[in-house]
C-alpha cells in the first residue's frame, strides 16, 4: 500500500511498533513541526490499513483507528517494504491486554487480564509469502509471550488456519464471548498469576448466599484451609445459646418480675425458649385489653326494624302551611305589580319552598333603557313596517305615518322625515299607556 508521502523517514526498521503517541519506536524529530507531521502521517496509514482489514473480515466498522489507539494502551506493529519510491506498508498487527471473563477446562468462569490479538492483516498481494509469520514472530518476541497464552478476538478462518499450521493450536476451549482461547491458556505463568483470587464459583441455586451456605472448595483450594475457615466463620456467626434456668430458681421470683423481663427481651433472641402465645397474652393483660370470644356476643340485642318512612309527623303540617303562605304571597305580588316596572317580570310559581327568581335589566336585555324611553321606542300597534324592495340582509326600512294619518297613502306623501306618532302627543305628550312620548331623534341612544 503506497501513500502520497514518503514513508522512509518514518520506518527506520522493517517492522516498527507504535503506541498511543502515534510515533514509531526509534523515531527522533528535530523540531515540533516534524513530530506533528509524523503523527499525521502515521494516523493516515493506520486509518487506511484498518479500513482494508475491516473490509477483508466483512466488518461494517474498522477495529483499528488512530483515535482508538490514542485513547488506549494497545500496540500496533506495522510492516514496511522499501522501494525506489515512497515505500509500501504491507501488514498490520494490533495487540493489547484486556480483562476477560472466560471459561476454564472445568467450566468455571474466571476473570483474567490476558494479552489479546485484536487485529491482524496482510495485504492480499503479499499473502502466502511468509510475511504474516514474520510479523507475528516479531510481536511474540517483543511482548515475550507464547502463542497459546493469547486470546484471539473474532478470528477469521484464515487466522485459525494460520495458528494451526505454524503453532499447532487445535484444541479450543468453548467460550460465550467472541474470544477464542486454546488449551494451555490457563497453564501459562502470566495468565496464572492474573487468575489468583478472582475465580468465580457459579452454582445453580441462589439460596446459598441468602442462607449463608459456603461454596465447596475449588480444585486450587486446600481442603484443610477450607475446613479451618469454615469452622472459624461458624464460630463468629453463630450466637451463644441462652442457658435455661432451673424451675427451682423461678419459683422464688415474683410473677411481675418475670413478665417485665419477658417484655424487655428481644423476640429474635428469645424465640427459641419463649412461647409466643403466652407472651402475646401477657402483653394484652398488661395493656388492659382482653380477648373477647364468640360466646360473649350473645347478650348483644338484635337490631330492630326501621320505622315506616311514610308515617305522619307534625313537621309535615308546618311544611304544608309554609307552602300555602308562599303561594299566597306569589298571588298577591302578581296582582300588585305595576306595568311601569320593567325590571320585574312574571315568574312561574314554584311548588317547593324555593323563592322565585327576580330578573333584572341585565338579564332582560333592557339594561340601557329607562322606563319612559323603553316605552317610547318599543314598537306598538301604531307603527307600520313597509319594505317594498329587498335592501339586503338585515336592513329593514320603517315608514311611520305623518301626523294622525293611518292610511297607506300617507306613507308616500313626499315627506321623508320618519317619526313615531302616538295619540295625544300634541297636547299631553303622554301615550295611551301613560308613558312619555319621545322622538327617536331626541333619544341619545339613537
From Swiss-Prot:
This is Alpha-tubulin N-acetyltransferase. Keywords: Acyltransferase, Transferase. Acetyl-CoA binds at residues 120-133, 156-165. It catalyses: L-lysyl-[alpha-tubulin] + acetyl-CoA = N(6)-acetyl-L-lysyl-[alpha-tubulin] + CoA + H(+). It comes from the Eukaryota. Belongs to the acetyltransferase ATAT1 family. Residues 204-254, 335-359, 385-432 are annotated as: Disordered. Residues 204-215 have a biased composition (Low complexity). The record marks 57 as: Crucial for catalytic activity. Its EC number is 2.3.1.108. Residues 1-186 form the N-acetyltransferase domain. Specifically acetylates 'Lys-40' in alpha-tubulin on the lumenal side of microtubules. Promotes microtubule destabilization and accelerates microtubule dynamics; this activity may be independent of acetylation activity. Acetylates alpha-tubulin with a slow enzymatic rate, due to a catalytic site that is not optimized for acetyl transfer. Enters the microtubule through each end and diffuses quickly throughout the lumen of microtubules. Residues 413-432 have a biased composition (Basic and acidic residues). InterPro entries: Atat, GNAT_ATAT.
Amino acid at each position: 500500500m503506497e501513500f502520497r508521502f514518503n514513508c522512509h523517514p518514518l520506518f527506520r526498521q522493517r517492522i516498527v511498533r507504535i503506541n498511543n503517541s502515534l510515533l514509531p519506536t526509534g523515531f527522533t524529530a528535530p523540531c515540533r513541526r516534524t513530530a506533528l507531521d509524523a503523527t499525521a502521517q502515521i494516523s493516515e496509514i493506520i486509518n487506511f490499513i484498518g479500513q482494508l482489514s475491516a473490509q477483508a473480515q466483512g466488518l461494517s466498522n474498522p477495529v483499528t483507528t488512530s483515535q482508538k489507539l490514542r485513547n488506549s494502551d494497545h500496540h500496533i506493529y506495522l510492516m514496511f517494504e522499501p522501494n525506489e519510491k515512497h515505500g509500501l506498508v504491507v501488514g498490520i498487527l494490533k495487540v493489547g491486554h484486556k480483562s476477560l471473563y472466560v471459561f476454564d477446562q472445568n467450566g468455571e468462569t474466571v476473570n483474567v487480564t490476558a494479552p489479546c490479538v485484536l487485529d491482524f492483516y496482510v495485504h492480499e498481494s503479499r499473502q502466502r509469502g511468509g510475511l504474516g509469520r514474520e510479523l507475528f514472530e516479531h510481536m511474540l518476541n517483543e511482548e515475550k509471550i507464547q502463542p497459546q497464552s493469547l486470546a484471539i478476538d473474532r478470528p477469521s478462518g484464515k487466522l485459525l488456519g494460520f495458528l494451526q499450521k505454524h503453532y499447532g493450536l487445535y484444541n479450543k476451549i468453548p467460550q460465550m464471548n467472541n474470544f477464542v482461547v486454546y488449551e494451555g491458556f490457563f497453564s501459562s505463568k502470566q495468565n496464572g498469576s492474573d487468575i489468583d483470587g478472582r475465580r468465580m464459583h457459579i452454582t445453580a441455586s441462589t439460596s446459598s448466599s441468602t442462607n449463608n451456605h459456603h461454596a465447596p472448595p475449588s480444585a486450587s483450594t486446600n481442603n484443610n484451609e477450607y475446613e479451618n475457615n469454615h469452622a472459624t466463620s461458624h464460630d463468629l456467626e453463630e450466637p451463644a445459646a441462652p442457658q435455661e434456668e432451673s424451675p427451682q430458681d423461678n419459683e422464688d421470683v415474683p410473677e411481675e418480675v418475670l413478665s417485665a423481663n419477658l417484655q424487655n427481651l428481644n423476640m429474635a433472641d428469645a424465640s427459641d425458649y419463649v412461647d409466643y402465645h403466652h407472651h402475646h397474652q401477657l402483653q394484652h393483660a398488661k395493656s388492659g385489653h382482653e380477648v373477647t370470644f364468640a360466646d360473649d356476643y350473645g347478650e348483644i340485642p338484635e337490631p330492630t326494624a326501621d320505622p315506616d318512612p311514610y308515617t305522619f309527623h307534625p313537621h309535615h303540617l308546618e311544611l304544608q302551611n309554609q307552602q300555602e303562605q308562599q303561594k299566597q304571597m306569589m298571588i298577591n305580588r302578581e296582582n300588585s305589580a305595576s306595568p311601569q316596572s320593567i325590571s320585574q317580570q312574571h315568574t312561574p310559581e314554584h311548588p317547593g319552598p324555593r323563592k322565585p327568581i327576580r330578573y333584572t335589566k341585565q338579564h332582560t336585555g333592557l339594561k340601557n333603557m329607562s322606563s319612559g324611553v323603553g316605552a317610547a321606542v318599543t314598537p306598538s300597534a301604531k307603527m307600520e313596517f313597509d319594505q317594498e324592495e329587498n335592501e339586503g340582509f338585515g336592513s329593514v326600512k320603517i315608514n311611520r305615518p305623518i301626523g294622525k294619518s293611518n292610511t297607506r297613502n300617507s306613507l308616500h306623501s313626499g315627506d321623508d322625515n320618519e317619526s313615531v306618532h302616538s295619540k295625544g302627543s300634541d297636547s299631553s305628550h303622554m301615550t295611551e299607556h301613560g308613558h312619555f312620548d319621545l322622538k327617536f331623534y331626541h333619544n341619545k341612544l339613537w
